[in-house]
């Protein structure tokens, strides 16, 4: 019988995970007793490790007498044994400085977030482009660039701008274009996509009949809003492929797996980072959550993700704009470091976007622990 998960067995489980994360080799009882000066014999530790294996927290490769953690073991560690850590003040200052060097550039912020996550957590990283939760129209400007061509500059709240050329009749003057753009701007002021689509059928505005040209401008705005939402849904940034492939799990020389399985794991890693395959259901879950999500190995429910753990967090401004960022790596992951890195980058992105949108940032899970350092 395996017996209860006693305090000593919890300590042994924690040490096995720490040792395995550090060395990537199965952990023997003698190693734990010697390295951590445990006040019990190797035989006692061996019995406890056997009990932990019966309970489903540990397993052992057929070629080794040592044990390694299972997904269940990692889950228990994350939820019950892991010590919560923070990035050092020096790391926070360095990261914050990098972000403020590209202040106000959304795409650059997301790409930088991926780069910093990968470098700091020593694994691959992913992030979705921030998507307006309620994309709202702000203004339309028409600029004459030729007697039969104009540039439409469509501005949405939050600094999102879309530009598109459109044909115009040669008799339309710049003043005609300005007047039409002003009328459409007033008609669609602060409207969401749903409202813009409703207004697209309007025949008049404030008693003034809308011309075919003006209704065409409304249709142009509708298409721009739809295109933006579709693009935001599909756009996934990634970084850190080399960081991830440097792990022993991707080296045939480590002896952990044969070359064929290692190559297959590399192929799946490339596919995940390139297309986001396997992350599909995780993104909406993270967007709906206010905290850090940790998904370990087989918990994904997808065979392609069985060897990976994913740590994700939502970032953005509540009710305005939001995205998801996080790290991907082997289940043998330094969870405290990875979680604290994801949490800090998400809180930093919250603050940057709140400044951009001129609103008060809503603290995310664990954000208060960074408050003093961010304003140091």
Curated annotation (Swiss-Prot):
Pfam families (alphabetical): HrcA
Question: What are the entry keywords?
Answer: Repressor, Stress response, Transcription, Transcription regulation
Source domain of life: Bacteria
List the Gene Ontology MF annotations in alphabetical order. DNA binding
Query: Could you tell me the Gene Ontology terms of the biological process aspect for this record?
Result: negative regulation of DNA-templated transcription
In terms of SUPFAM superfamilies, this protein maps to: GAF domain-like, Winged helix' DNA-binding domain
Family, according to the entry, reads as follows: Belongs to the HrcA family.
Function, as annotated:
Negative regulator of class I heat shock genes (grpE-dnaK-dnaJ and groELS operons). Prevents heat-shock induction of these operons.
Instruction: Show the NCBIfam families listed in the entry.
Output: hrcA
Q: Per its record, how is this protein called by name?
A: Heat-inducible transcription repressor HrcA
Q: Name the source organism.
A: Chloroflexus aggregans (strain MD-66 / DSM 9485)
């Amino acid at each position: 019988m395996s017996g209860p998960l006693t305090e000593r067995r919890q300590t042994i489980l924690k040490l096995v995970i720490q040792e395995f994360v550090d060395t990537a080799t199965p952990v023997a009882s003698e190693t734990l007793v010697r390295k951590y000066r445990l006040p019990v014999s190797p035989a006692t530790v061996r019995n406890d490790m056997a009990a932990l294996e019966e309970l489903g927290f540990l397993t052992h490769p057929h070629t080794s007498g040592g044990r390694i953690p299972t997904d269940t073991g990692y889950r228990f560690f994350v939820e019950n044994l892991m010590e919560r850590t923070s990035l050092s003040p020096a790391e926070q200052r360095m990261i914050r400085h990098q972000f403020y060097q590209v202040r106000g550039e959304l795409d650059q912020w997301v790409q930088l977030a991926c780069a910093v996550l990968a470098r700091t957590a020593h694994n691959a990283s992913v992030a979705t482009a921030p998507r307006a939760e309620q994309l709202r129209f702000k203004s339309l400007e028409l600029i004459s660039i030729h007697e039969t061509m104009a540039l439409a500059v469509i501005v949405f709240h939050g600094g999102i701008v879309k530009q598109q050329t459109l044909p115009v009749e040669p008799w339309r003057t710049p003043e005609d274009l300005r007047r039409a753009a002003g009328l459409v701007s007033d008609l669609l002021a602060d409207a969401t996509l749903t409202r813009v689509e409703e207004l697209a059928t309007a025949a008049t505005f404030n008693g003034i009949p809308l011309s075919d040209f003006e209704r065409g401008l409304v249709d142009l705005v509708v298409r721009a809003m739809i295109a933006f939402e579709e693009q935001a849904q599909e756009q996934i940034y990634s970084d850190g492929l080399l960081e991830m492939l440097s792990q022993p799990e991707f080296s045939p020389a480590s002896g952990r797996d044969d070359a064929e399985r290692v190559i297959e794991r590399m192929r799946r890693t490339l596919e995940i980072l390139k297309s986001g395959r396997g992350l599909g259901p995780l993104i909406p879950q993270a967007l709906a959550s206010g905290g850090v999500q940790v998904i370990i190995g087989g918990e994904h429910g997808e065979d392609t993700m069985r060897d990976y753990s994913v740590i994700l967090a939502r970032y953005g401004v509540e009710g305005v704009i939001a995205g998801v960022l996080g790290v991907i790596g082997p289940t043998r992951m330094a969870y405290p470091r990875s979680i604290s890195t994801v949490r800090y980058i998400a809180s930093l992105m919250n603050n940057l976007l709140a400044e951009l949108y001129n609103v008060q940032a809503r603290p995310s899970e664990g954000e208060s622990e960074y408050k003093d350092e961010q304003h140091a």
